[in-house]
């Protein structure tokens, strides 16, 4: 099964080698038929402490690195 890749915004970089990423998605409410925005926070491994709060990043699934971290940050694409 392929690993999932999500895009989000860093909301916290206070942990050592850890960032908290907020991922937003839109769904259609099953009863109201209205488009609703949902968000979820993921703890992701950032080996180099390279990302700061407010940056848009991509994360990929990985083997568990700790109790909360099962995602790691994809490296920045070089232009």
UniProtKB/Swiss-Prot annotation:
Keywords assigned by UniProt, alphabetized: Ribonucleoprotein, Ribosomal protein, RNA-binding, rRNA-binding
Organism this protein belongs to: Caulobacter vibrioides (strain NA1000 / CB15N) (Caulobacter crescentus)
GO MF, one annotated term: rRNA binding
Protein family (similarity comment): Belongs to the universal ribosomal protein uS17 family.
Superkingdom: Bacteria
Gene3D superfamilies in the cross-refs: Nucleic acid-binding proteins
Signal peptide: none
Pfam families, sorted: Ribosomal_S17
GO cellular component, as recorded: cytosolic small ribosomal subunit
Protein name: Small ribosomal subunit protein uS17
BP GO annotations: translation
């Amino acid at each position: 099964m392929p690993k999932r890749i999500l895009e989000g915004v860093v909301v916290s970089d206070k942990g050592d080698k850890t960032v908290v990423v907020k991922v937003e998605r839109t769904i259609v409410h099953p009863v109201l038929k209205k488009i609703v925005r949902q968000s979820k926070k993921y703890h992701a491994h950032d080996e180099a402490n390279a990302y700061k709060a407010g940056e848009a990043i991509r994360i990929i699934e990985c083997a568990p690195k700790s109790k909360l971290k099962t995602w790691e940050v994809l490296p920045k694409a070089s232009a």
